[in-house]
């Protein structure tokens, strides 16, 4: 679970940290990684590594699976937090469906609740929502004065196709962007731990219109990066991927940045007053979205302050604890089992009919 690689890692670690701060013992459990599971990058968070997935069955307390719906028995009813959209390949469907049949489901937005309830064919009321959050430092980090005379644009997402990096590359060549010397663009190396990320990194390094800086592996360092930029772009793909939320948008607004984001998935739910929504997968739309953000000027301090009071870690953990304490919905597996038992149970009508045919309990004329 390397730091600086994605929102689900920050979400998980942030929850565990806040739970322990409140005196609620919690830990991050990894499988098959030993001590090389990322714990060295989160020294204030307890980690526990298991040799094999089956060992999860021996854990005490509440077990929360993150993203991967492994069908493993647990001592108590378990939860599953789904940060990603459902898989689009049919070969992955059985794993997703089977692994969620006996779990209490948690998602990160209203959009994700609708998406997963449709995919799994379950009542949307049985899917709980626990919104992500920005760490407090994003709202409190001081913004330095911009003495460059330029508008600084940051792509803070992972270097992966679904985050819209190729749309951004197209946008760099559109006239209203390319011909403006007062625009600067920066991306980080988040995601270069994957092969596709390393390929995209090389493309960006070769491009004269964008700078590449090292990924930030802590909330504090990312807040420092965002507060030296004016606009954060999130041109996420909508063809084969849908952002279920978009925590970078929250972090950016808490940091005092405007956000230009795809009007898709859960991204509209991240608007704290500083989001400009654009048509996804559309370089021209992204270009005009950036221009609109430039024309709007810096995000007002009052908007940043108000944004900083929304989507906090305290609010997120309050919601999580509420999910843990409320009665659990009946799982799909339990419903199927009950239906099977009902089908296999002797019918009352059939039993009564047999009795009547044997001359017990009324005449044949009284049968329905």
Protein language model regions, located:
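A charged, aromatic-enriched C-terminal amphipathic alpha-helix characteristic of glycosyltransferases
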Residues: 7, 49, 138-140, 295-350
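A conserved mid-protein helix/loop that constitutes part of the nucleotide-sugar donor-binding site
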Residues: 10-14, 151, 160-174
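Glycosyltransferase donor-sugar binding loop
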Residues: 32-34, 183-198
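A short, active-site helix/loop in glycosyltransferases that binds the activated sugar's phosphate group
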Residues: 89-93, 101-126, 134-137
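Short beta-strand->alpha-helix junction loop in the catalytic core
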Residues: 111-112, 129-140, 190-192, 307
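Nucleotide-activated donor-binding/catalytic signature segment of Leloir-type glycosyltransferases, i.e.
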Residues: 197-220
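Nucleotide-sugar-dependent
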Residues: 236-249, 268-269
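Conserved acidic donor-binding segment of nucleotide-sugar-dependent glycosyltransferases
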Residues: 275-283, 290-297
